[in-house]
Amino acid sequence: MSVTFKDDVHRILKFVANCNGRFEDSKCDIRESPLGGLGVFAKTDIAEGESILTLNKSSIFSASNSSIANLLCDSSIDGMLALNIAFIYETTVFRNSSHWYPFLRTIRIRDDEGHLNLPPSFWHADAKRLLKGTSFDTLFDSLAPEEEIMEGFEIAVDLAHKWNDEFGLEIPKGFLDVSEENHEEDYNLKLEKFISVAYTLSSRGFEIDAYHETALVPIADLFNHHVSDPDLKFVSLYDVCDKCGEPDMCKHLIAEEYLEAENLDKNMPKVASMETRVIDEDLIKSLENDLEKEYSNVTANIEDDDGGIENPDECVDLVLKNDVAQGQEIFNSYGELSNVFLLARYGFTVPENQYDIVHLGPDFMKILKKEEKYQEKVKWWSQVGHGLFSAWYAQMRQEDEEDEDGQAKSDNLSDDIESEEEEEEEEGDDSLESWLSQLYIDSSGEPSPSTWALANLLTLTAVQWESLFSKKATPHISDSIVNEEKLPFLAKKDNPHSKKLLSNLLKEKQLPCIKGDNSSKITSATKSMLQNARTLVQSEHNILDRCLKRLS
């Protein structure tokens, strides 16, 4: 989600330069992207392994280095909530004195039409209809309001008043200063702004290390996402002191080691005198001074070797993982994410996303409720069959992988059915959502293993059911020999009756229609909402078409 305007680019570059950051502007150009918003393009051919952005961690913005870091720490606020509150204070109360304000002011919580950037879970009811019935709605329930964000707003408002009462700290105007006179209306307006801040920062945050956690990184957030072939990798040393951010030994680690030694000493026979077992503050300070001298020498050597470049462990880098040709847009990646996750967290969608799926859980439930003949089979599947089939199928896939590619791949299976088994373990065997969530079609139009299995099960004749999976036929259904004999039948993909059942189910599936007059009637939908909804819905329509062709 690009929420940086073209006019802001010079401010960002100036901020990075003032922080002694290094951006290869001789090789890279920030300009408008065909994908929308801004992007970063290669001015010349750039080789794999080159770092095109290097920033000291002191120049990024996190809750841990913000103007209210101590207050957040004392209040035990961390994670994204801490970053959201810190951003609000930094851009309002401390804007005139903040080191980061020249950068933070370029992060917009409104689009180019002036509308707040809101996640679909907080769209107005008529706009939510744009995604009704899609996987966004039925599988992930992402149209339901997120209670965590609303609770976060309550916490932020309470803290703002507490800090104001105790320290005289100004309450951020326009964000956390909820009016008592017109409470409900003003509360809702401020809540929406808080949600927009949270959504915007979520789309731009990078995981830095144990100290900074998620932070805002200038320039790094301007690179657009590529689904399958990103050009960049984000490099940052994560294992640092979570109290001060030091990558090497610090007073906190010294104290921890001392406590560990003291605890160990308590369990040892008491043969030494107290003088040999007690460490005092003077000794700790002496050790710290020795460490500082040693660190200064190491830093000096690094600067001599690297021409003045700072300690790499204290920097973040964007490094090319492949060659980039002149004129090519340089892409980052937010991960292997479907449009559902991209829209829910980052505010954009990608046409023909290879990680999209179409969820069929509610569609199966419709036919299961209509047909009495399916009830015994569904009961068996939900209570016993799905768990057995998932475990058996995963084992078969693992054996196939080992036979084809050796033992190495057995530890890194990527088949969808394994995730089914993991979710089964997490949610419990009796969870209705557990097996319904595994009924889907992938982006290529291929039904999931559980979808084929349930379709094959439902189309069994009475005689087949009695002989294969009924209680009479399988008194010891959990026996592995029985599983190996019976369960392979459910994995078949050439059963004409199953194909017909699936074809009918897909033809009856209802997805939103976002064309012409239909979308124009939704007055609360912004241009961005309509565009993202169209992309997501069209992707699901395309998947259904591919699947129908496979089944025909």
UniProtKB/Swiss-Prot annotation:
GO terms for cellular component: cytosol; nucleus. PROSITE patterns: SET (PS50280). Its EC number is 2.1.1.-. It is found in: Nucleus. Its main location: nucleus. Residues 399-432 are annotated as: Disordered. S-adenosyl-L-methionine binds at residue 334. Coiled coil: none annotated. The keyword Repeat does not apply. GO terms for biological process: methylation. Residues 413-432 have a biased composition (Acidic residues). It comes from the Eukaryota. The keyword Nucleus applies. Residues 26-335 form the SET domain. Keywords: Methyltransferase, Nucleus, S-adenosyl-L-methionine, Transferase. GO terms for molecular function: protein-lysine N-methyltransferase activity. Present with 7880 molecules/cell in log phase SD medium. Belongs to the class V-like SAM-binding methyltransferase superfamily. S-adenosyl-L-methionine-dependent protein-lysine N-methyltransferase that monomethylates 60S ribosomal protein L42 (RPL42A and RPL42B) at 'Lys-40'. This is Ribosomal lysine N-methyltransferase 3. It comes from Saccharomyces cerevisiae (strain ATCC 204508 / S288c).
